[in-house]
């Protein structure tokens, strides 16, 4: 199409001339109405209009070209003849959109179609214009010419619209055709890949099935032979005969046997005597000369490393483990670090950790039970026999002023058999009574303290608990404590309501108060028997004994008589004339004079036996308390007493238990004290604060308990192990020792027996008279168990004025201290333009050639930074300290 003027173009597209001139100027084409416009200028105008209407697809670049230039220097040759060559590498890379190459073909087709449409439109327009001009001049004039121009404009608009529709159809067809091709290609590739995977899987399954079939046939053929070989190997391993039961003695015995075997082999291979006489032993002609032989080394290098089995006990130190493996201690410590366990060379580790380390280093481990001897000794007993009914063991508990002692005295006076002279021996804590329905064994008040110790050790020496409550006084805090002990031992309870002869007796009040603590009488629908008795008049004593025997029948208590005895220590003491004396309650079997008894940490032969009346007896059956003499030491109350066969083995077991008890005692020294609670928390030993509280009145006790429980958080918890009203007793101290607790006394004090236990067990005991002080100290202890926070505080700043070189240290910074103090032991930072460039520590700090520990503000000094020499003039050296900030609740 020939170039036309701006006015003609405005007339063709039907827009005012002024508006078209403005749009051309906005697109960068400055034209007037009479100027001609080219095709490129029309395209520029069209792009500008599209951009204004939001179509920026053609405005965005489709290609991006990057030019890169790299310069480097290459040194050729060595020494003085070396030459440097400058190398410059230029790279040019063009990035094209993914769709551009594909769209070029479509763009070309669209351009061709548009050109053809334009040519046709131009020819048609020319023909129509010429015809219209002629007709206008000849026939109709100006009106006909205007109509023809309008028709020409409409025709061009239709042709342009048809061209655009064709371009859009081509683009749509391209998008529709591309998708099926890609989908078809993807489906074909997927089918091919699945077929290959299926074929490979079938081959692998066929090979695996063939291998399994071959292995099965081989196992069936050799099954019998393998079982015989395994049985022979196990039999050989078990053929280890030792004369002693000690592990160390067994190892020494094995070494001695191996030395003897090697000595016998050397004797067999010994050379003949050089002085022996014979036909060929003389000198001269009869002597035959042997041909010279090449010397052979006596040591043959092993083909592969032979690792020995090592025996590991329940506990072993790192040094002992290294010695058994013939390794250096540092190697074992390094191996433990790799496994995530940190230990020193003298630290004792458990059996599992030692086995893991040994197996990791390539050794085979044989785990040894150190208590194997103890189990063997206890198993070597005749435990078979006929079971018969035994007497119940009854513990009488209660407040000291509620008539417990009077009740025991009345039972003793009424039921001791005729002809038995003398009264009950006061220092023996157990005795038995014969009734018309059977025998009953009682544990008196000293047995109460032992009962707490038994409960902490898990021994169940008591069958029935009788709790004495005064009818005129009601339930006291120590009565509640007795109920707690009885419920913890899971023993049935019988309530004896004493002092019923008094006018102020109110048994219903006792029942009501006990029901608040989970003790319901049978009359109120519970399971606890209530007996109304009077120790003064003897009222209800027979009913109480009948209730005890009835409860024992329900329990169906049985024991074997004809076997070696075992029992529990009720009480023990050291007598000046007789030595260690222990009161033992026989639970099973028959204890005889001359038996060898293993009693906790002690052992010995029973040299004499006495009953509760002080009479010498020869034997004692089940549920009979006896006093034995002949032990090696004073046993602990609650320990188990067992009769064994061999005194030598009993001694070994006792010594082993003593060593184990020593380790446990050392471990128990880490008590939950207020001063070292944070240290214990860091070791992971304590996760909660155990407290035993004793107060003067019940109101204060409730207030303290509620306040302490409210202090508990997610990290630290307060656990009240026991609480009560009254003085701190021996029972409280024993309970605190067993549960690792702190004993808190509020306006109360500990009695003499409790102070002895507290001193021996190293229990933390605190007295308070103000509740706020108590809560504050416990709060501080809990805050100490929280993990601390750390904060860095700047203590000094020095400005570098000059830098010197030292042959020993390196760069020395001559500084002026501008703020605070510079300490040699504190860490430092080097700042350059207020940016930290190095963090480390000082290597030297000098003032006038003298080494100093600190330099204060306004003083010059020389500073050497360790492992850093890039100190420059103008740098700042900052000295700081790390401060630990304790967290609080």
UniProtKB/Swiss-Prot annotation:
Residue ranges of the region described as G1: 398-405
Cross-referenced CDD domains: IF2_eIF5B, IF2_mtIF2_II, mtIF2_IVc
Subcellular location: Cytoplasm
One cellular component (GO) term of this entry: cytosol
Bias-annotated ranges (Basic and acidic residues): 52-61, 214-241, 252-263
Segments of this protein annotated with the region Disordered: 47-85, 206-302
Region (G2): 423-427
SUPFAM superfamilies xref list: Initiation factor IF2/eIF5b, domain 3 (SSF52156), P-loop containing nucleoside triphosphate hydrolases (SSF52540), Putative DNA-binding domain (SSF46955), Translation proteins (SSF50447)
Annotated spans, G4: 498-501
Keywords in alphabetical order: Cytoplasm, GTP-binding, Initiation factor, Nucleotide-binding, Protein biosynthesis
One term of GO molecular function: GTPase activity
Sequence segments annotated as region (G5): 534-536
Sequence positions that bind GTP: 398-405, 444-448, 498-501
Region G3: start-end pairs: 444-447
Residue stretches making up the tr-type G domain: 389-558
InterPro entries listed in its UniProt record: DNA-bd_dom_put_sf, EF-G-like_DII, EFTu-like_2, IF2_assoc_dom_bac, IF2_II, IF2_N, P-loop_NTPase, Small_GTP-bd
UniProt similarity note: Belongs to the TRAFAC class translation factor GTPase superfamily. Classic translation factor GTPase family. IF-2 subfamily.
Biological role stated in the UniProt entry: One of the essential components for the initiation of protein synthesis. Protects formylmethionyl-tRNA from spontaneous hydrolysis and promotes its binding to the 30S ribosomal subunits. Also involved in the hydrolysis of GTP during the formation of the 70S ribosomal complex.
Name recorded for this polypeptide: Translation initiation factor IF-2
């Amino acid at each position: 199409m020939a170039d036309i003027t701006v006015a003609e173009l405005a007339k063709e597209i039907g827009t005012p001339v002024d508006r078209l001139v403005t749009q051309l100027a906005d697109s960068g084409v400055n034209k007037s109405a009479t100027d001609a416009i080219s095709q490129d200028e029309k395209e520029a105008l069209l792009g500008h209009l599209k951009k204004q209407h939001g179509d920026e697809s053609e405005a965005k670049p489709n290609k991006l070209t990057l030019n890169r230039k790299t310069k480097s220097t290459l040194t050729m040759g060595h020494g003085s003849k070396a030459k440097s060559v400058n190398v410059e590498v230029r790279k040019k890379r063009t990035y094209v959109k993914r769709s551009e190459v594909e769209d070029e073909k479509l763009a070309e087709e669209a351009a061709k179609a548009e050109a053809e449409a334009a040519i046709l439109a131009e020819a048609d327009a020319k023909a129509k214009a010429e015809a219209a001009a002629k007709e206008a001049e000849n026939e109709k004039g100006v009106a006909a010419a205007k109509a023809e121009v309008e028709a020409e404009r409409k025709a061009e608009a239709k042709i342009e619209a048809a061209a655009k529709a064709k371009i859009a159809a081509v683009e749509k067809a391209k998008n529709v055709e591309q998708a099926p091709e890609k989908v078809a290609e993807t489906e074909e590739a997927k089918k091919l890949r699945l077929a290959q995977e299926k074929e490979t899987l079938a081959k692998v399954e066929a090979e695996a099935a063939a291998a399994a079939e071959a292995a099965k046939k081989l196992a069936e053929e050799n099954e019998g032979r393998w079982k015989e070989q395994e049985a022979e190997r196990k039999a050989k391993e078990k053929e280890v005969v030792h004369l002693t039961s000690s592990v160390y003695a067994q190892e020494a015995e094995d070494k001695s046997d191996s030395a003897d075997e090697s000595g016998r082999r050397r004797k067999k291979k010994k050379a003949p005597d050089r002085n022996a006489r014979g036909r060929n032993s003389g000198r001269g002609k009869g002597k035959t000369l042997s041909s010279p032989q090449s010397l052979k080394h006596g040591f043959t290098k092993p083909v592969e490393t032979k690792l020995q089995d090592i025996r590991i006990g329940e506990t072993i130190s790192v040094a002992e483990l290294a010695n058994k493996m013939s390794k250096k201690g540092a190697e074992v410590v390094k191996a433990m670090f790799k496994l995530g366990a940190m230990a020193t060379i003298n630290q004792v580790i458990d059996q599992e950790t030692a086995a893991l380390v040994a197996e990791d280093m390539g050794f085979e481990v044989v785990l040894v039970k150190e208590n194997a001897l103890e189990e063997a000794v206890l198993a070597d007993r005749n435990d078979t026999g006929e079971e018969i009914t035994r007497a119940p063991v009854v513990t009488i508990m209660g407040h000291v002023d509620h008539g417990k002692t009077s009740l025991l005295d009345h039972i003793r006076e009424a039921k001791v058999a005729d002809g038995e002279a003398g009264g009950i021996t006061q220092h023996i804590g157990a005795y038995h009574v014969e009734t018309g329905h059977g025998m009953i064994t009682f544990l008196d008040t000293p047995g109460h303290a032992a009962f707490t110790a038994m409960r902490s050790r898990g021994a169940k020496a008591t069958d029935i608990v009788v709790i004495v409550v005064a009818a005129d006084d009601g339930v006291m805090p120590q009565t509640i404590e007795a109920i707690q002990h009885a419920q913890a031992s899971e023993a049935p309870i019988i309530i004896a309501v004493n002092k019923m002869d008094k006018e102020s007796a109110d048994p219903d009040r006792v029942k009501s108060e006990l029901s608040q603590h989970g003790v319901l009488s049978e009359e109120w629908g519970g399971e606890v028997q209530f007996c109304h008795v009077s120790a003064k008049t003897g009222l209800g004593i027979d009913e109480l004994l009948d209730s005890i025997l009835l409860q024992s029948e329900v329990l169906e208590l049985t024991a074997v008589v004809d076997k070696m005895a075992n029992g529990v220590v009720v009480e023990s003491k050291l007598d000046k004339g007789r030595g260690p004396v222990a009161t033992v309650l026989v639970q099973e079997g028959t204890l005889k004079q001359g038996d060898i008894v293993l009693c906790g940490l002690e052992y010995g032969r029973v040299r004499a036996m006495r009953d509760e009346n002080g009479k010498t007896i020869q034997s004692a059956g089940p549920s009979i308390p006896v006093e034995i003499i002949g032990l090696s030491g004073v046993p602990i109350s609650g320990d188990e007493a067992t009769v064994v066969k061999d005194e030598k083995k009993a001694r070994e077991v006792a010594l082993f238990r003593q060593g184990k008890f020593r380790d446990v005692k050392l471990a128990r020294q880490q008590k939950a004290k207020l001063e070292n609670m944070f240290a214990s928390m860091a070791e992971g030993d304590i996760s909660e604060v155990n407290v035993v509280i004793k107060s003067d009145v019940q109101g204060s006790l409730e207030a303290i308990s509620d306040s302490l429980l409210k202090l508990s958080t997610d990290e630290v918890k307060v656990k009240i192990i026991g609480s009560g009203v009254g003085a701190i007793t021996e029972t409280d101290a024993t309970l605190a020792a067993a549960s690792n607790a702190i004993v808190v006394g509020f306006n109360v004090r500990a009695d003499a027996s409790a102070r002895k236990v507290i001193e021996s067990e190293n229990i933390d005991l605190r007295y308070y008279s103000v509740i706020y002080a108590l809560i504050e100290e416990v709060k501080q202890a809990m805050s100490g168990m929280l993990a601390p926070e750390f904060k860095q505080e700047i203590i000094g700043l020095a400005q570098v004025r000059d830098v010197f070189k030292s042959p020993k240290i390196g760069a020395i910074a001559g500084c002026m201290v501008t703020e605070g103090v510079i300490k040699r032991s504190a860490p430092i930072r080097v700042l350059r333009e207020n940016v930290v460039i190095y963090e480390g520590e000082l290597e030297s700090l000098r003032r006038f050639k003298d080494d100093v520990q600190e330099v204060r503000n306004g003083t010059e000094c020389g500073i050497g930074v360790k492992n850093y020499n890039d100190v420059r003039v103008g740098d700042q050296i900052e000295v700081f300290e790390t401060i630990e900030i304790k967290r609080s609740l």
